Regions:
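Membrane-proximal, non-transmembrane interface segments of integral membrane proteins
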Residues: 96-99, 112-114
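Terminal membrane-proximal soluble interaction domains of membrane-associated proteins
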Residues: 105-181
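Short, structured loop/turn "capping" segments at alpha-beta junctions
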Residues: 91, 95, 102-107
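Membrane-targeting alpha-helical segments
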Residues: 1-91
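Generic preference for well-ordered secondary structure
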Residues: 3, 61-64, 68, 79, ...
Length: 181
């Protein structure tokens, strides 16, 4: 079992406390000076307890390499430009298929190889694919031939794993590799 590191504990504590402020509606009051002290103190206590028990599960020490400014800028660029472009393309494609019954729908599950090694990179790629309409990442599997994603695709354009991967992943995998590896 992993030990809880101080940066992981503090990061989890801060995230928990911000979440506490959000769900109790205290964020505006904090800035205007009208926050109820008992709610703020209760939030600190709950956040400390939550961080003490969960920090080792939520934040791995390898995640802190993201504090590199180049990686943070790349992550921001990916989210704003690369992922949004893929998201808009997929939305338009699914909307066309929904509004025009003549367009083919050929659903299926395809095996897509990936060269990503880090859990964070695989998770981000899987979630990026799932968040784009028309695709759902069903499984991430470490197999003899490497790591593969099994993706349900609304319109299977190719059954060849490499070609299907190029169509589904686009440039997302390359950008995610720059961020996490």
């Amino acid at each position: 079992m992993r030990k809880t590191t101080l940066p992981a504990f503090i990061s989890t504590l801060v995230v928990c406390y911000i979440f506490w402020l959000l769900i109790t509606g205290q964020i505006p009051a904090v800035f205007t000076g009208g926050a109820a002290p008992q709610i703020l103190i209760a939030g600190v206590l709950v956040s400390v307890l939550a961080a003490a028990f969960t920090a080792r599960f939520f934040i791995h020490s390898k995640a802190f390499h993201l504090f590199n400014p180049v990686r943070l800028f790349t992550l921001l660029f990916y989210c704003i430009f690369i992922f949004m472009k893929e998201l808009i393309k997929a939305n338009v494609d699914v909307a066309k298929r929904a509004l025009s019954p003549k367009l083919p729908v050929n659903p299926g599950i395809v095996k897509v190889p990936t060269e990503l090694k880090s859990d964070y990179g695989l998770s981000m790629l899987s979630n990026s694919i799932t968040l784009t309409p028309g695709t759902i990442t069903m499984d991430v599997a470490d197999e003899d031939d490497g790591t593969n994603l099994y993706i349900h695709w609304i319109d299977v354009g190719s059954e060849d794993p490499k070609e299907a991967g190029d169509q589904i992943k686009g440039t997302m995998e390359n950008w995610i590799r720059r961020i996490f590896e």
